[in-house]
Amino acid sequence: MRKPLVGINMKNYINTRAQTSEWLEATIPLLENFSDVDTFIFPSMGTLETTANLLAGTSFGFGPQNMAPEKSGPLTGEFSVESIIDLNANYVEIGHAERKNLFHEKTSEIAKKIKLALDEKITPVVCVGEEVHANDTNELKNALKKQIEALFQTINLAQWENVVLAYEPEWAIGKASSAETNYIESAHQALREIIRELGGDETLVRIIYGGSVSKENAAEIVRQKNVDGLFVGRFGHKPQNFADIVSIVSKTKG
């Protein structure tokens, strides 16, 4: 059985060591009774060491919001997987829509990052999702299949179980409301079908939903069979809000 998972991406909203410390010190105690749910945070890149120190000895996972496609070399401004390992981080966010749209990351580069993370035993949280709302399930599956085939063509089949897919339809990111619940379930089901068609064991892969997640929609979303958890954005900037989401997932999936 796949263990439920809730994560939060701080982007560049909570950027100082003091702010990050305040958030973590408030949040960690609120999660003590939810051992049936895995949690992780992608803090602002400048606060990774602070995060590592505060989360040492806890089950709260963390990692950077991006990483270089190579271990080392002339890659100015990138973040090496060697640094991730050195921090004892266990997750890395890869392929977020903002990385592709603002920084023009290519699919081939993202695929290399995924493979490198898996080879180095770091769990990649790989963001996938269509740019516009699909008209039907076939159109939705075809859009997702094109992405998955391009991103995962170089991984070993056994590595699939170490992948986390974050389904984030680009048209729902940062909006007032999430995608429709039945649409979300259709996308998650399609992703499992695609993994199976590529030879992976879809029953082992955790797929979480991200895009305007809140207390109001969390329970209905994670009640869906193929949804394993949630990827929270600005709603989780208040520690109690993040803890409430974890609680909802625990009650619904735990």
From Swiss-Prot:
Enzyme class, broadest EC rank: isomerase
Database matches in PROSITE patterns: TIM_1, TIM_2
Keywords: Cytoplasm, Glycerol metabolism, Isomerase
Molecular function GO terms recorded: triose-phosphate isomerase activity
Catalytic residues of the enzyme: H96 (electrophile), E168 (proton acceptor)
Organism: Listeria innocua serovar 6a (strain ATCC BAA-680 / CLIP 11262)
Presence of the UniProt keyword Thylakoid in the record: no
EC annotation from Swiss-Prot or TrEMBL: 5.3.1.1
Family as reported in the entry's similarity comment: Belongs to the triosephosphate isomerase family.
GO annotation terms (biological process): gluconeogenesis; glyceraldehyde-3-phosphate biosynthetic process; glycerol catabolic process; glycolytic process
SS bonds (residue pairs): none
Quaternary assembly: Homodimer.
GO cellular component, one term: cytoplasm
Protein name per UniProt: Triosephosphate isomerase 2
CDD domains (UniProt xref): TIM
Role noted for this protein: Involved in the glycerol metabolism. Catalyzes stereospecifically the conversion of dihydroxyacetone phosphate (DHAP) to D-glyceraldehyde-3-phosphate (G3P).
Induction: Repressed by GolR.
Catalysed reactions listed for this entry: D-glyceraldehyde 3-phosphate = dihydroxyacetone phosphate
Cell compartments where the protein resides: Cytoplasm
Annotated residues for binding of substrate: N9, M10, K11, G174, S212
Pfam families associated with the record: TIM (PF00121)
UniProt-listed InterPro entries: Aldolase_TIM, TIM_sf, Triosephosphate_isomerase, Triosephosphate_isomerase_AS
